[in-house]
């Protein structure tokens, strides 16, 4: 059987942190594993949206940079050499007569005995700055992602938004930029209390309650933004080198909603085995829901082994759901 028609034990749809850990764990269970990821690189939102952000709620790490966590997860799964298919968005999943699954992407067709969906919040894109002239500066010095902090070294930066990402980005930029302003339409930020406390103690100029109403530039780059006080008459113009927008992201399940899975809002319903309503399809991470679900990376790390162990039992009912401890596997 060649690679095109090989039937894998477990195919993981979604190469974010939970998918990477699921691949490692499936490797420990001696499963043949394939990861299918729609983005050009592994890591999901951590690599694409927040590679420079620090994460503080991962067990064993007082803090860890998002991309560092992804790199460690990739390194962890490497001994088991899972097959990785990048830039392939899954369009459909069909159960075959023999009980295996046919997984069709825009590029290829894959086959698997079981599937674990770890697609996070599904397809996502940023909410954009809805102002005339803004679009022409996107990709120049209006940004929706921060992939490399060093590019802002010595520059005057304004960050727009009031959530965790906006506040965290502002705090990180303070260390490298010549000046940082944060613009939010409300007086109170929605970010974690600890981050807001750090913001208030920092040198960052806090512009609240203001919204941007105009962007000005020379056609090649943005040079100024005009701010308007919410429910007030005060206006202010900032001279800046970079404008970072964090209004959040719009996500959708995309084709997943057509796969016959039982859904609740934009999440896939699972039972205590992380099993969907379709036998052989499991979920882990933010994509799934159940009573009492908490959406954290740490939660997904716990769900992934449950999904893998039950998937292995589905493939071969003689296989133990409760595995040996990892300390005995690597001796």
Curated annotation (Swiss-Prot):
FAD binds at residues 37, 45, 50, 90, 124, 286, 327. Gene3D superfamilies: FAD/NAD(P)-binding domain. Binds 1 FAD per subunit. Its cofactor is FAD. The keyword rRNA-binding does not apply. One of its GO terms (molecular function) is flavin adenine dinucleotide binding. It holds the Pfam family Pyr_redox_2. SUPFAM superfamilies: FAD/NAD(P)-binding domain. InterPro entries: FAD/NAD-bd_sf (IPR036188), FAD/NAD-binding_dom (IPR023753), Fd--NADP_Rdtase_type_2 (IPR022890), Ferredoxin-NADP_redctase_2 (IPR050097). Keywords: FAD, Flavoprotein, NADP, Oxidoreductase. Its EC number is 1.18.1.2. It catalyses: 2 reduced [2Fe-2S]-[ferredoxin] + NADP(+) + H(+) = 2 oxidized [2Fe-2S]-[ferredoxin] + NADPH. Homodimer. Belongs to the ferredoxin--NADP reductase type 2 family. This is Ferredoxin--NADP reductase 2. It comes from Listeria innocua serovar 6a (strain ATCC BAA-680 / CLIP 11262).
